[in-house]
Structure formats: C-alpha cells, structure tokens
Amino acid sequence: MSVSTRPEVTTGYWWMPRDGAAATVVLFSGGTGGIGYRDGEPKSGNFLIRSRDEFAKAGFNVALMGNPSDMPKLNPVFRQSPEHFADVRAVLQDIRTRSPAPIWLVGTSQGTISAAAAGIDLGFSIQGVVLTATLSGHQFGGSVSDLPLDKLSVPVLVHQHAKDSCKITPPYLAARLMGKLTAAPVKKYMEVDGGQNPTGPPCEAFHYHGYIEMESEAVAQISAWIKHPVP
C-alpha cells in the first residue's frame, strides 16, 4: 500500500488483513525503520517484521509501517517530528477505510520512539501502545525517556527481555518508564526470559534484544495483553 501523507510525499505500508480481527497492530521496526523490501516481500530481520505472521495468527490485522519517500532512513529526531506524525496519521486513516478494528501501535528498539511519540500525538484515536526492547537510554536525538510520557493517555505495555544487553535498551531503564506513564489508564512492565543462540552485536535483531528463538512466545505474551490489558 502507498499513501499520500504530505505534499509530494508518499509512505508505504504492508497490509495483512484478518477476518474478524480483534485489533490492528501497526508495527514500527527499529534501526533506520522500514520493511526491508526484497523481491516484493518484507525481508527485514527486525523482530517485529519477521514476527508478522505470529501477530496475524493471534487474530490481528497487521500493518508494517514503511518509511516516507523523502526520508528513506529514519533517525530519532525525525521519529519525534510533526512530519512523522503526519505520515502515521495518514496511514492510520487509510487503514481505517479497510478495517474498523481498534488500532495499537507496536514498536521495537528505535521504533519505540515512533510508537510512543505518535501515541502521544494521536491521543484517544488509538487503543494502546506496546514498546519492546525500549530505547530508553541516552543517545543523540533523544529516546523514549525524553518524551512527555505523562501525556500518553492510552494503555501501555513495556515488554523487555531480561538478557537484553544493548547499552541503550537496558531493562532497568525500561522499568523506570512506569513512573512516567501517569496518564495511562492501564500500564504494565513485563520482563521476560527465554530464547537461545544469540548472534551478532547485542543491539542487533538476532540477539536477545530481538527475542531470538522466542519470537512466538513473545508475540503470544504481547497479543494476550493487547486483548486483555491488565496492570
């Protein structure tokens, strides 16, 4: 799908509809964003992108958020910008023409900046926000910890792998976000363990940071909470 999101700018997204969907999950990948199109299919190794079928099996419509035509690689500053919010709003408007299901924003790593910041911007027009491997440590351009989280007014799940050793997504900082989510009607910090055989640098998708070899379990935990948000 390709949507006109700003003057002379289009933003693509990958749409996976599900009959009788309990919700629509809009997935924001980490790194510089995007879907990793190759041969007409999403090929990114990002945790959320590679787990898209698991979300579909859980009974959700799935939308993979692409990058806008004027910003092929996202950065933390853009993820907090009015331009990014305009892109997200336009994509959600298009999604609503396809399904009336309530919308959840789900981000991982750098994508948690997008999910949280856009969630603040969108207010009650969305159902909730899920943050995985949350970018809560210090980095140039800002992190989730720097956002006005007291203005995030929908249910929020912070889902974190206990063995995530990426220096900008440590579990202890993710846990501290709970104290800042004062407007969220329901909030939950869920720290999990599992998986095996991590490879590559600790901030990459096939390490514990990306829930390696526990993708199905992680998606099941997230999906259950989306369907029944409890503290």
Model-derived features with residue positions:
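Alpha/beta-hydrolase active-site loop
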Residues: 47, 51, 73-98
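Short, surface-exposed "cap/lid" segments of acyl-processing enzymes
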Residues: 18-54
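The feature captures the conserved acid-bearing segment of alpha/beta-hydrolase catalytic domains
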Residues: 128-194
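C-terminal catalytic histidine-bearing segment of alpha/beta-hydrolase fold enzymes
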Residues: 184-231
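Second-shell loop/turn segments in exported
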Residues: 38-42, 51-52, 73-82, 160-163, ...
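Conserved alpha/beta-hydrolase
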Residues: 52-72
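Primarily recognizes the serine-hydrolase "nucleophile elbow" in alpha/beta-hydrolase
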Residues: 93-151
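N-terminal cap/lid segment of alpha/beta-hydrolase-fold proteins
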Residues: 1-20
